[in-house]
Amino acid sequence: MIISPPILHAHIDTEKDSDWVNRMMSVDPERNFPMNSGRSWHGGVHLNGNLSETVRCIADGKVISIRQPEPAENTVPPLNYNGVTDKGYVLIKHETEIGSGEEGKIVYYSLYMHLRSIDSNVQPGNTLYRKEPVGAAGMVDGQNAFHFQIFCDDENIQKITGRISPETDLNKDGRTDVVYGDSHFYLPAGTPIYGDMPEENSLANNSPVQRTSVPLYVTMSFDKGNCTMVTRQQHEVLSDTYTEVGSPLINADGKDYEYNLYSYALQLYPKSPSAGYEMLRFGRVVNTEYEELVPADAPLWRTINTPQGKGVVNLGARDIRVYSDGDFPHWTGWKLVNDDADTNSQCNSPTILCTTRNDLSRMICHFPLEWDSATVESRFEWLKSPNDVLSKPMTEPDLDLLIEHCKALCLVDNPLPARRVWHFDPRQFIAHFRKCGWLGENDIISVVRRYQNAYPMTSELTRPLSKDTLIERIISQGQNSSGEVIRPAGLKNELSKSLRKYLITTPLRIAHYFGQMARETGRFASFIENGDSSYFDMYEPGTEQGLKLGNNVVGDGARFKGRGTIHLTGRENYRNYGKYRNPSDDDFFTTEPNNQLPVENAYFSCDAGGYFWASKQKYIIVSHRLTPSGSLGVNYWADKGCSLSDAREVTRRINPAADGFDLVRWPAFEHSWYVLNDEITPPLN
């Protein structure tokens, strides 16, 4: 899922992404979410702007309803009710993916109301792509602003949040088909907290112990090499509020904790490093079809804050529950609100009216869509009766004026069912899903460059990579003319699972990864190193390359040719990957035909690439000795930036000779980076 705000301006260095989203969406406090100042439901927010501000599409989607503005009408009734008001709008339906399987496929809608003008490309049935212009901000009640909202139906609220209940179910772990963002842990009262880490990651801990007296909620997040642990507890009086315990702990259990997850997995989980990597990354094993933790109850010891001070806890203990941002944990503010049973526009929700929290932006509220002309009269009927909002009830003529104004703004030929929908604060929805990082089919299509080479030849210009061909490549097995498998089936989901596991989830990291894959796989065409039999002689025992790769048996050159999303090459690398996956059988991938798995099995093909990415260390010569330079893993180098030199440095971690950098890797990176970032001016290529 790729998403951004409807207003786009440059990021500021060191600015948090959520802060940038809020800066892009300056909200009128009188027209906020989920209520306006008159205590009526308000399904979106009014974004303050100016008449020259371009409103942009937040994500790829299809235009399903539109109304052109009429400047001559906005100064007179019924549009001019409290001031000049524009009636132009665009309604977009977004179909995207946030995880694997059917539960990972979601539908939501975005509405851009009170537009002064609408871009000529915006037509019913047309597809709009993220960052494309929708139109220009107009006027609302005499103020420069436009209304913006995001909502979904009943079926999709369960897919999006994983539940229909107000709060997270604390009796079971969170979803495994939709996992993204931070990891969260529920520690019931009575959880043992120890004074020190046990030796060798032992399940037994003989250091002093005390037990928690109240439930605790721990969040584990990764960012640019750091791992941050935050503990919360429920407020003793304000039951709807969860307060932080102590200050966030950053890298309390090791320097550059995120970058070093691979080395920690080898150290702490010597019998199953790959599954151990998932424990460190997710707090649990997620890919259970291919990963098995040994022993099954291997612990996850982490330092956290408690009301009594810092302590060490086994977050892998049986009684502790594990979730991700994909479960919308209620202790981080997310709550489903569905307790206003009437059908009028007045907010009568006890949850909203009686809450003790000041911030309602993570309330997901179920109430009628305010733009349905068929329900306008019934939604505003309450204004004729005594109420707490108006000093006296509205007269029939006054109410008629309001109703005519509302009808003039309602959707034309409303394509949506006349029922309640689930409303999100659009700032929170966008900020939340910018942490998702899951690439669906259409996302992969967008991120892959149409042309392989920076300067394509005539043959490629006339036959660029088509959408249908790319879909076939990420779904179906591929074979060469000799019947040899060159590409596994089922790459789409397994690639996103691998990117998620190895924390290749930020736009910059994903762009660098796809830049490398463009050369390594020919844009998903072949996941095996190309060449005739004589080509691989340069990798044979006794050659310079063969010695570097640990090839010591005749035939190793072809036997251990490059395979995977990022090519695993050479006997030593195949053996090391085997040690990482299953140390009890470290020759698994060096034994034929298992050496073929990184090209025949989509999971191993993608996982081998992720393993290579996470385990790669740069070395330099210092005083005639090879010395590590920089942190472990390619993510460290990817985080450096998006310049030509940054991309070249990443490339040298994958291919020391930087093969194909200028012609393929760099233009592929530039393309992917533009698709994923928030710039509105594309690169020249």
Predicted feature residues:
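Conserved positions in beta-strands of structured domains
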Residues: K62-I64, M113-R116
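Surface-exposed, glycine-biased beta-strand/turn segments
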Residues: M1-G88, K93-G101, Y129-R130, A137-M139, ...
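Active-site loop architecture of trypsin-fold serine endopeptidases
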Residues: A137-H147, F151
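Substrate-binding clefts and substrate-entry loops adjacent to catalytic sites
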Residues: Y574-E600, K618-W637, R648
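Extracytoplasmic
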Residues: H42-G44, I58, K87, V107, ...
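Acidic, glycine-anchored pre-beta loop/turn
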Residues: D119-L128
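Substrate-binding/active-site groove segments that recognize
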Residues: P464-D468, E472-R473, K561-Y580
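Cell-wall glycan-active module
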Residues: M1-P34, E103, D119-S120, I150-G515, ...
